[in-house]
C-alpha cells in the first residue's frame, strides 16, 4: 500500500470486501482475486472546524461556481454592449434562483412524497440536497423575469448566460467528489475509485465524468459563436447549451449508481421503464425536456435567417 496523501491511496481491494457490502450482483463480473490498485478516496469533506461551525470543500466549490459564473456573465454582457450595472443587478436575482431552484428541485424531483408530507423539511438546508435540474429551472424562470424587467428578449439573456453556466457547473461536481456523493456504479476500469466513506467497492468516478461535460460544452459554444452562424439573441447559443450539456448528462447518468428515486416509481415513468426493459435514472428523465427545448431553440434560430454579421442592427 502506498502512503495516504490527504486521504488518497492506491491499494488492492479484495473482491470479498465488495461482496460483503451487499453488492454481489454488481461485482459478480470481477475476478475473485485482488482488484488492480484502485484509487481509495477517503478525504474528510470538512476542511476546517471552528467549534460548531465548519468549512466544507463543497461550500468552497459552491462559492467558486458562483464566482466563475458571474465573471463569465459579466464579461459577456459588457462585450455585447450592456452596462456594468445591468450585469451586477442579475446577481441579486441569480443567486437566490440557484439556491431556491436547486433545493426545490431536489425535494420534489427526487423525494416528493417525503417533502409533500412534511413541507417544512424543505427549509432544512443543513441536511443537504440541491438538484442541478432544479437550478436550471430556477435560472430559466429568473432569466425570463429579468428580461421582462429590462425589456430585453429572453433568448438574448440566455445566449449571454449559457457559457457562464457551462464553465461554472463543474465546480459543483468537484464538491460532490469531496463529499463522496453522486457516486458511480461498480466498475473494474483502471481509473475506478473506492469511496471509502461510502463502501469498499471500486466505482466509476461519475462526478468527474460530469465535471468534464461543462468545459466541453463551453468549448462547443465558443466554436458555434465564432463560426458567425446566428447573432446573439437568436437563441442558438442557449439552444446548443441545452442540447449538448443535457444530452451528455443523459449519457453519463448511466454510469451513476441507483438510489431510491420516488419519481421513477410514479406512473407513467415506471410503466415506461418496464416496457423498455431497463432502468432509467431520474436525472435522465429530467434531462429530456431541456434537450427538446434546446433542439427547438436551435431550429428556431436557424429558421430566422439572420447572420452574426448583422448583430449591429439587431442588438438593441
Question: What role is predicted for each listed range?
Answer:
Residues 2-3, 12, 16-29:
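Low-acidity, Ser/Thr- and Arg-rich intrinsically disordered low-complexity segments
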Residues 3-4, 22, 38, 301:
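Absolute N-terminal positional cue centered near the fourth residue
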Residues 29-316:
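Hydrophobic, membrane-interfacing alpha helices
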Amino acid at each position: 500500500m502506498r502512503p495516504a496523501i490527504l486521504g488518497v491511496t492506491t491499494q488492492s481491494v479484495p473482491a470479498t470486501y465488495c461482496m460483503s457490502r451487499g453488492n454481489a450482483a454488481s461485482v459478480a463480473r470481477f475476478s475473485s482475486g485482488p482488484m488492480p490498485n484502485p484509487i481509495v478516496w477517503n478525504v474528510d469533506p470538512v476542511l476546517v472546524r471552528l467549534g460548531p461551525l465548519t468549512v466544507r470543500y463543497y461550500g468552497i466549490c459552491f462559492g467558486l461556481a458562483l464566482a466563475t459564473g458571474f465573471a463569465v456573465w459579466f464579461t459577456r454582457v459588457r462585450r455585447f454592449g450592456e452596462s456594468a450595472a445591468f450585469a451586477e443587478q442579475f446577481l441579486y436575482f441569480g443567486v437566490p434562483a440557484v439556491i431556491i431552484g436547486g433545493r426545490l428541485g431536489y425535494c420534489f424531483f427526487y423525494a416528493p412524497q417525503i417533502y409533500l408530507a412534511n413541507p417544512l423539511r424543505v427549509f432544512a438546508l443543513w441536511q443537504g440536497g440541491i438538484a442541478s435540474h432544479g437550478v436550471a429551472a430556477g435560472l430559466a424562470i429568473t432569466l425570463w423575469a429579468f428580461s421582462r424587467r429590462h425589456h430585453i428578449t429572453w433568448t438574448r439573456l440566455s445566449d449571454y448566460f449559457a457559457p457562464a453556466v457551462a464553465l461554472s457547473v463543474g465546480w459543483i461536481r468537484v464538491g460532490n467528489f469531496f463529499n463522496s456523493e453522486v457516486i458511480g456504479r461498480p466498475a473494474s476500469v483502471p481509473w475506478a475509485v473506492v469511496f471509502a466513506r461510502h463502501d469498499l467497492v471500486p466505482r466509476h468516478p461519475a462526478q468527474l465524468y460530469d465535471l468534464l461535460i461543462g468545459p466541453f460544452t463551453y468549448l462547443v459554444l465558443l466554436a458555434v459563436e465564432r463560426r458567425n452562424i446566428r447573432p446573439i439573441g437568436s437563441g442558438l447559443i442557449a439552444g446548443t447549451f441545452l442540447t449538448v450539456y443535457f444530452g451528455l448528462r443523459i449519457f453519463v447518468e448511466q454510469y451513476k449508481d441507483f438510489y431510491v428515486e420516488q419519481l421513477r416509481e410514479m406512473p407513467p415513468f415506471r410503466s415506461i421503464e418496464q416496457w423498455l426493459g431497463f432502468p432509467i435514472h431520474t436525472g435522465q428523465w429530467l434531462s429530456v425536456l431541456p434537450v427538446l427545448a434546446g433542439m427547438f431553440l436551435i431550429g428556431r434560430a436557424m429558421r430566422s435567417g439572420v447572420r452574426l454579421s448583422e448583430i449591429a442592427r439587431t442588438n438593441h
